[in-house]
């Protein structure tokens, strides 16, 4: 009995230690803002975007439902005769010539479909690529087929549900410009508790010739709630910045280096909670701040990542 209790205590300590190391703070492309007790930080952001509490989640595998798998197989123009692998970790399909491949991985919670890049030219243009106006419907139908609710999807760059884009190739032939669009695509990311997940769950799809899916990548884990914590108030967040417990996101090259010891002031214009997992199995919350930094030479828009909960508590 004593041995069992000891093992449980050790496990609890290991978990607590792990949670004090938010994977967001391990990002190599971020700059640690140095501690500075006299840093002038001004909060002008609405606080209604910050919930009263947030959760830490454990990322779990996703076996995907038989219905979802069947729909994806048909969507990617495969049949059971094209299956090349099936086991407890997932399944895989391949076209007879080996050019098209579909893999569904349960441990990584991922659906991945690839086709060769089309060899296009002025005499071999893409055919009947769906117009941009059709992409919302195509994307919505795609998500329904893999049992992803629209309520769990959001876009990037302050957009609604999806981000649509297209490549454009131009050929100059006999004094004539020929334009060609090889595909139109969509990107989306996942939300949990209405909070977006950064660089983890979400997906993208390419719609090419005749509206067929030419590429598909979806990552969609199952989640298990570990614990909840109250979020920090604005004054506590300001103190974290002064204590050097925040990261500066990269700035444009024309901005150059921000000399934080000489910064005149930081004005927080917007505060948004986000989730991040990195290379771990834990989904951890943090707070993204949109700020105006007065460097003494001008005002610079700077993104700052900081804790949204007291990470010193187990």
Segment roles from a protein language model:
Residues 110-114, 210-220, 283-286, 297-306:
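Short, well-ordered strand-loop elements centered on a beta-strand within folded domains, enriched
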Residues 21-183, 189-196, 219-227, 310-313:
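Preferential activation on post-signal-peptide N-terminal prodomains/segments
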Residues 8-16:
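Bacterial N-terminal signal peptides
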Residues 205-284:
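Charged, low-complexity helical/coil segments in non-catalytic cytosolic or luminal regions
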Residues 1-4:
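Positively charged n-region of N-terminal signal peptides that target proteins for export
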